[in-house]
């Protein structure tokens, strides 16, 4: 899916159907809104039942979460939160990747992601590794929706704290700083994390050193990368980062793009369904759902009109308050 103008031109080229970009935008917004509501209803059903009805194979899985920024017209930059789930195997990359996303708060994201979590059997899965950065809202999501998961701090994220501490201590671009960083990065990945924390502790005190030391110490159980790799666990969250590039930013973060929130949310919903390879099954629900919603709105308007209508009614056809109506 691309910009509405070129998309309208492609539609005419391949099908002969002429449609203005404004009409295509309106229809896309309507479809996206409907798809989002369908997914919300499914998430509500998962919340009620605690899972999905069909059996889901209990295979090793990775779950990663991250955010990227989308520019909204009236709200400025807002974070689009994305969940990526994939099956782990002996070979990389992950297989059967699927996603869930929203522009809402962390709580709203948790509610809307329940559907995909249920489809993939995450609440009942026995072997889930979650690789993320250390953001509190992400850890809260895992606490609530996948407490049994093995937690790994994204290695590149952890190494970034070491790089910042090295720059603050040795100066930017210095050979000493580069050598210290390379050595500690290697030790963090292949050796003992306690040695890395000790190396940080002996650096001269600075805000960057203290931040790195406190951050990694608080996540000590999530940085045992040598042990994780020995178990065959992933230590990077590239699946969700590439998901942001392909699913979210590939459409919503172009040059000069600013979005109305409903349009952005609708596009995200459509792109998620497409990326999850459920376009055909979901689209089959869109038409019936839109017709049902239209009937419900029509019935509601009819009820309102009847409630507002005067209680007086003519006794027979053709009679009004002013006398008989004669079509002369």
Explain the meaning of each model-derived region.
Residues 1-328:
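Catalytic center-proximal scaffold of phosphoryl-transfer enzymes
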């Amino acid at each position: 899916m691309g910009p509405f103008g070129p998309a309208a031109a492609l539609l005419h080229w391949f099908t002969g159907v002429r449609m203005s970009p404004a009409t295509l935008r309106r229809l896309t917004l309507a479809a996206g809104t409907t798809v989002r509501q369908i997914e919300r209803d499914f998430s509500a059903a998962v919340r009620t039942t605690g899972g999905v009805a069909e059996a889901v194979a209990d295979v090793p899985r990775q779950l990663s979460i991250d955010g990227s920024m989308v520019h909204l017209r009236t709200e400025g930059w807002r974070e689009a939160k994305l969940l990526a789930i994939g099956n782990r195997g002996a070979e990389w990359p992950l297989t059967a990747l699927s996603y869930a996303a929203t522009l809402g708060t962390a709580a709203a994201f948790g509610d809307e992601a329940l559907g995909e979590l249920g489809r993939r059997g995450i609440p009942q899965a026995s072997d889930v590794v979650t690789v993320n950065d250390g953001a509190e809202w992400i850890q809260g999501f895992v606490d609530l929706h996948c407490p049994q998961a093995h937690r790994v701090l994204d290695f590149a994220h952890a190494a970034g704290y070491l790089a910042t501490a090295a720059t603050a201590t040795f100066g930017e671009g210095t050979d000493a700083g580069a050598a210290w960083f390379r050595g500690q990065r290697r030790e963090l990945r292949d050796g003992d994390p306690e040695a890395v924390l000790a190396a940080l502790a002996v650096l001269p005190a600075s805000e960057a050193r203290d931040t790195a030391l406190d951050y990694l110490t608080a996540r000590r159980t999530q940085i045992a990368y040598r042990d994780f790799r020995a178990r065959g666990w992933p230590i990077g969250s590239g699946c969700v980062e590439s998901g942001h590039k392909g699913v979210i930013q590939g459409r919503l973060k172009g040059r000069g793009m600013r979005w109305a929130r409903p349009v952005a949310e609708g596009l995200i919903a459509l792109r998620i369904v497409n990326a999850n390879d459920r376009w055909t099954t979901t689209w089959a629900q869109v038409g019936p759902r839109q017709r049902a919603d239209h009937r419900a709105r029509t019935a509601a308007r009819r009820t309102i009109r009847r409630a507002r209508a005067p209680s007086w009614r003519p006794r027979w056809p053709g009679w009004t308050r002013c006398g008989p109506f004669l079509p002369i």
